[in-house]
Design a protein with these regions (language model features):
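Conserved beta-strand hairpin/beta-sheet module of binuclear metal-dependent hydrolase folds
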Residues: 2-7, 12-92, 194-209
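Short, P/G- and charge-enriched loop/turn segments at secondary-structure junctions
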Residues: 36-41, 120-122, 182-183
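Cap/insert and terminal regions of metallo-dependent hydrolase folds
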Residues: 76-83, 87, 198-280
Length: 280
Protein backbone atom coordinates (compact mmCIF):
# COMPACT_ATOMS: atom_id res chain seq x y z
CA UNK A 1 0.00 0.00 0.00
CA UNK A 2 1.22 3.52 -0.73
CA UNK A 3 0.26 6.77 1.00
CA UNK A 4 1.86 9.89 -0.40
CA UNK A 5 5.60 9.34 -0.64
CA UNK A 6 5.56 6.24 1.55
CA UNK A 7 5.17 2.54 0.89
CA UNK A 8 3.50 0.95 3.91
CA UNK A 9 4.32 -2.48 5.37
CA UNK A 10 3.00 -4.45 8.33
CA UNK A 11 5.88 -6.11 10.21
CA UNK A 12 4.67 -8.93 12.46
CA UNK A 13 7.41 -10.22 14.74
CA UNK A 14 5.48 -12.68 16.88
CA UNK A 15 2.81 -13.66 19.35
CA UNK A 16 2.49 -13.63 23.13
CA UNK A 17 -0.26 -13.96 25.73
CA UNK A 18 -1.65 -11.78 28.48
CA UNK A 19 -4.48 -12.30 30.94
CA UNK A 20 -7.78 -11.81 29.15
CA UNK A 21 -9.45 -10.17 32.11
CA UNK A 22 -6.68 -7.61 32.36
CA UNK A 23 -6.94 -6.92 28.64
CA UNK A 24 -10.69 -6.21 28.79
CA UNK A 25 -11.13 -4.61 32.21
CA UNK A 26 -14.74 -4.58 33.42
CA UNK A 27 -16.08 -6.37 30.34
CA UNK A 28 -17.37 -9.81 31.43
CA UNK A 29 -15.48 -12.86 30.22
CA UNK A 30 -18.65 -14.26 28.65
CA UNK A 31 -18.40 -11.36 26.18
CA UNK A 32 -14.68 -11.00 25.50
CA UNK A 33 -14.05 -14.75 25.35
CA UNK A 34 -16.18 -14.88 22.19
CA UNK A 35 -13.83 -12.38 20.56
CA UNK A 36 -10.50 -13.85 21.70
CA UNK A 37 -10.82 -17.22 23.48
CA UNK A 38 -8.55 -17.73 26.49
CA UNK A 39 -6.31 -20.69 27.30
CA UNK A 40 -6.37 -22.75 30.51
CA UNK A 41 -4.50 -19.96 32.32
CA UNK A 42 -7.01 -17.31 31.16
CA UNK A 43 -4.46 -15.85 28.73
CA UNK A 44 -5.40 -14.60 25.27
CA UNK A 45 -3.31 -14.50 22.11
CA UNK A 46 -1.85 -11.14 21.12
CA UNK A 47 0.47 -10.12 18.31
CA UNK A 48 3.45 -7.79 18.18
CA UNK A 49 3.00 -5.83 14.97
CA UNK A 50 5.10 -2.87 13.85
CA UNK A 51 4.51 -0.47 10.98
CA UNK A 52 7.21 0.29 8.41
CA UNK A 53 7.07 3.37 6.17
CA UNK A 54 9.48 3.61 3.23
CA UNK A 55 10.22 6.69 1.12
CA UNK A 56 13.18 7.68 -1.03
CA UNK A 57 14.74 9.45 1.94
CA UNK A 58 13.52 7.65 5.07
CA UNK A 59 12.70 4.25 6.49
CA UNK A 60 10.52 4.75 9.55
CA UNK A 61 9.68 1.93 11.98
CA UNK A 62 6.91 2.26 14.56
CA UNK A 63 7.57 0.13 17.67
CA UNK A 64 9.91 -2.85 17.87
CA UNK A 65 8.03 -5.71 19.56
CA UNK A 66 9.30 -7.91 22.39
CA UNK A 67 12.85 -8.40 21.17
CA UNK A 68 14.85 -11.44 22.26
CA UNK A 69 16.69 -10.45 25.45
CA UNK A 70 14.25 -12.27 27.76
CA UNK A 71 14.94 -15.50 29.68
CA UNK A 72 13.02 -18.79 29.70
CA UNK A 73 10.87 -17.76 32.68
CA UNK A 74 9.67 -14.64 30.86
CA UNK A 75 9.07 -16.67 27.72
CA UNK A 76 6.94 -19.16 29.67
CA UNK A 77 4.90 -16.56 31.58
CA UNK A 78 3.93 -14.74 28.40
CA UNK A 79 3.92 -17.77 26.05
CA UNK A 80 6.23 -15.91 23.68
CA UNK A 81 6.50 -17.18 20.12
CA UNK A 82 8.46 -14.65 18.15
CA UNK A 83 11.35 -13.79 15.91
CA UNK A 84 13.56 -10.73 16.27
CA UNK A 85 12.41 -7.49 14.70
CA UNK A 86 15.53 -7.74 12.52
CA UNK A 87 14.42 -11.11 11.14
CA UNK A 88 10.88 -9.82 10.66
CA UNK A 89 12.26 -6.94 8.60
CA UNK A 90 14.40 -9.33 6.56
CA UNK A 91 11.26 -11.26 5.63
CA UNK A 92 10.06 -8.07 3.93
CA UNK A 93 13.43 -7.46 2.27
CA UNK A 94 14.91 -4.86 4.64
CA UNK A 95 17.81 -4.80 7.11
CA UNK A 96 18.10 -2.96 10.41
CA UNK A 97 20.94 -0.70 9.30
CA UNK A 98 18.62 0.86 6.70
CA UNK A 99 16.18 2.18 9.32
CA UNK A 100 16.52 5.95 9.70
CA UNK A 101 13.81 6.63 12.30
CA UNK A 102 12.23 4.57 15.08
CA UNK A 103 9.07 5.95 16.65
CA UNK A 104 8.39 4.36 20.04
CA UNK A 105 4.75 4.70 21.08
CA UNK A 106 5.72 4.03 24.70
CA UNK A 107 8.34 2.11 26.63
CA UNK A 108 6.41 -0.98 27.78
CA UNK A 109 8.41 -4.13 27.08
CA UNK A 110 6.06 -5.41 24.37
CA UNK A 111 6.47 -2.19 22.39
CA UNK A 112 10.17 -1.44 22.72
CA UNK A 113 11.84 -4.74 23.64
CA UNK A 114 13.31 -5.01 20.15
CA UNK A 115 14.86 -1.54 20.35
CA UNK A 116 18.00 -3.03 21.89
CA UNK A 117 19.81 -6.36 21.57
CA UNK A 118 22.75 -8.34 22.90
CA UNK A 119 25.92 -7.92 20.85
CA UNK A 120 29.30 -9.23 22.01
CA UNK A 121 28.09 -9.41 25.60
CA UNK A 122 26.77 -5.83 25.59
CA UNK A 123 23.26 -4.43 25.16
CA UNK A 124 23.27 -2.01 22.22
CA UNK A 125 20.66 -0.25 20.06
CA UNK A 126 19.27 -2.57 17.39
CA UNK A 127 19.04 0.22 14.81
CA UNK A 128 22.47 1.82 14.97
CA UNK A 129 21.82 4.36 12.21
CA UNK A 130 18.42 5.52 13.46
CA UNK A 131 17.04 8.26 15.64
CA UNK A 132 14.64 6.93 18.26
CA UNK A 133 11.74 9.32 18.92
CA UNK A 134 10.52 9.14 22.53
CA UNK A 135 8.45 11.65 24.48
CA UNK A 136 10.65 13.15 27.22
CA UNK A 137 7.82 13.13 29.76
CA UNK A 138 7.17 9.46 29.08
CA UNK A 139 10.87 8.60 29.34
CA UNK A 140 10.99 10.31 32.73
CA UNK A 141 7.91 8.35 33.81
CA UNK A 142 9.52 5.08 32.71
CA UNK A 143 12.50 5.81 34.95
CA UNK A 144 10.20 6.29 37.97
CA UNK A 145 6.92 4.48 37.24
CA UNK A 146 4.05 3.83 39.61
CA UNK A 147 3.60 0.62 41.58
CA UNK A 148 0.83 -0.29 39.14
CA UNK A 149 2.90 -0.18 35.95
CA UNK A 150 6.52 -0.63 37.00
CA UNK A 151 6.57 -4.27 35.82
CA UNK A 152 5.86 -3.05 32.28
CA UNK A 153 9.19 -1.22 31.99
CA UNK A 154 12.53 -2.97 31.47
CA UNK A 155 15.33 -0.42 31.51
CA UNK A 156 17.61 -2.50 29.28
CA UNK A 157 15.07 -1.85 26.52
CA UNK A 158 15.69 1.89 26.47
CA UNK A 159 18.58 3.13 28.63
CA UNK A 160 21.23 1.85 26.16
CA UNK A 161 19.63 4.00 23.44
CA UNK A 162 20.24 7.07 25.60
CA UNK A 163 23.78 5.93 26.41
CA UNK A 164 24.52 5.69 22.68
CA UNK A 165 23.05 9.18 22.12
CA UNK A 166 20.40 7.96 19.69
CA UNK A 167 17.27 9.35 21.37
CA UNK A 168 15.48 12.33 19.87
CA UNK A 169 13.34 13.49 22.79
CA UNK A 170 9.98 14.91 21.77
CA UNK A 171 7.53 17.16 23.59
CA UNK A 172 3.86 16.99 22.67
CA UNK A 173 2.25 16.57 19.26
CA UNK A 174 4.56 17.17 16.31
CA UNK A 175 5.10 16.46 12.61
CA UNK A 176 7.82 14.23 11.19
CA UNK A 177 7.12 15.68 7.75
CA UNK A 178 4.21 17.04 5.70
CA UNK A 179 2.45 13.65 5.65
CA UNK A 180 3.23 12.27 9.10
CA UNK A 181 1.81 13.67 12.33
CA UNK A 182 2.42 12.35 15.84
CA UNK A 183 -0.57 12.58 18.20
CA UNK A 184 -0.44 11.90 21.94
CA UNK A 185 -2.76 10.03 24.25
CA UNK A 186 -2.37 9.57 28.00
CA UNK A 187 -5.09 7.20 29.24
CA UNK A 188 -2.99 4.05 28.94
CA UNK A 189 0.30 5.63 29.97
CA UNK A 190 1.58 9.22 30.04
CA UNK A 191 2.40 10.66 26.60
CA UNK A 192 1.87 7.66 24.34
CA UNK A 193 2.71 8.54 20.71
CA UNK A 194 0.48 7.59 17.77
CA UNK A 195 1.60 7.96 14.16
CA UNK A 196 -0.94 9.30 11.69
CA UNK A 197 -0.01 9.40 8.01
CA UNK A 198 -2.24 10.91 5.34
CA UNK A 199 -2.04 12.10 1.75
CA UNK A 200 -5.49 13.67 1.77
CA UNK A 201 -7.12 10.57 0.31
CA UNK A 202 -5.96 7.75 2.58
CA UNK A 203 -5.07 7.87 6.27
CA UNK A 204 -3.50 5.34 8.63
CA UNK A 205 -3.64 5.72 12.41
CA UNK A 206 -1.35 3.55 14.52
CA UNK A 207 -3.50 2.66 17.51
CA UNK A 208 -0.81 1.38 19.87
CA UNK A 209 -2.36 0.63 23.25
CA UNK A 210 -5.13 3.20 22.94
CA UNK A 211 -7.05 0.58 20.93
CA UNK A 212 -4.85 -2.53 21.14
CA UNK A 213 -7.10 -4.82 19.08
CA UNK A 214 -10.22 -4.53 16.94
CA UNK A 215 -12.15 -6.06 19.86
CA UNK A 216 -11.39 -2.86 21.80
CA UNK A 217 -13.25 -0.56 19.42
CA UNK A 218 -16.35 -0.26 21.70
CA UNK A 219 -15.82 2.62 24.13
CA UNK A 220 -16.14 0.59 27.40
CA UNK A 221 -13.69 -2.08 26.20
CA UNK A 222 -10.67 -0.67 28.02
CA UNK A 223 -7.71 -2.49 29.53
CA UNK A 224 -7.09 -2.82 33.27
CA UNK A 225 -3.48 -1.96 32.42
CA UNK A 226 -4.57 1.61 31.62
CA UNK A 227 -3.50 4.06 34.30
CA UNK A 228 -6.41 6.40 33.56
CA UNK A 229 -9.23 4.37 31.96
CA UNK A 230 -11.76 7.22 31.89
CA UNK A 231 -9.27 9.29 29.93
CA UNK A 232 -8.80 6.35 27.54
CA UNK A 233 -12.54 6.34 26.88
CA UNK A 234 -12.56 10.09 26.21
CA UNK A 235 -9.60 9.72 23.84
CA UNK A 236 -11.39 6.94 21.97
CA UNK A 237 -14.46 9.19 21.71
CA UNK A 238 -12.26 11.77 20.02
CA UNK A 239 -10.39 9.46 17.63
CA UNK A 240 -13.05 6.97 16.52
CA UNK A 241 -15.68 9.43 15.19
CA UNK A 242 -13.00 11.14 13.13
CA UNK A 243 -11.72 7.77 11.92
CA UNK A 244 -15.26 6.94 10.80
CA UNK A 245 -15.96 10.29 9.14
CA UNK A 246 -12.67 10.32 7.23
CA UNK A 247 -12.49 6.54 6.62
CA UNK A 248 -9.15 6.09 8.37
CA UNK A 249 -7.37 2.76 8.42
CA UNK A 250 -6.89 1.76 12.05
CA UNK A 251 -3.69 -0.28 12.46
CA UNK A 252 -3.55 -2.66 15.44
CA UNK A 253 -0.37 -3.66 17.21
CA UNK A 254 -1.81 -6.53 19.23
CA UNK A 255 -4.75 -7.95 17.26
CA UNK A 256 -4.00 -11.65 16.59
CA UNK A 257 -6.59 -11.88 13.83
CA UNK A 258 -6.37 -8.71 11.75
CA UNK A 259 -3.76 -6.02 11.18
CA UNK A 260 -6.03 -3.17 10.19
CA UNK A 261 -9.65 -2.14 9.70
CA UNK A 262 -11.93 0.64 8.63
CA UNK A 263 -15.07 1.22 10.68
CA UNK A 264 -18.76 1.85 10.14
CA UNK A 265 -21.61 2.95 12.39
CA UNK A 266 -23.65 0.08 13.77
CA UNK A 267 -26.63 -0.25 16.09
CA UNK A 268 -24.41 -0.37 19.19
CA UNK A 269 -21.64 1.97 18.08
CA UNK A 270 -18.74 1.65 15.71
CA UNK A 271 -18.03 -1.73 14.15
CA UNK A 272 -15.62 -3.21 11.63
CA UNK A 273 -16.30 -2.45 7.96
CA UNK A 274 -13.21 -3.81 6.15
CA UNK A 275 -10.33 -5.94 7.46
CA UNK A 276 -6.66 -6.48 6.64
CA UNK A 277 -6.22 -3.45 4.41
CA UNK A 278 -2.50 -3.68 5.19
CA UNK A 279 -1.66 -7.41 5.09
CA UNK A 280 0.93 -8.97 7.41
Amino acid sequence: MKIGNYEIYSIKSGMFRLDGGAMFGIVPKVLWNKLNPSDELNRINLSTRSLLLISDKRKILVDTGLGNKFDEKFKSIYAVENISIEDALKQKGFVSDEITDVLITHLHFDHTGGSTKFENGQIVPTFRNAKYYIQKSHFDWALNPSDKDKASFIKDDFLPIKEFNQIEFTDGNFKLDNEIEIILSSGHTPSQQHLKITDGKNTIFYCGDLIPTSAHIPYPYVMSYDLYPLITIEEKKKILPQAFEENWILFFEHDPFTSSVTIAEGKKGFEIKEKDIIPD
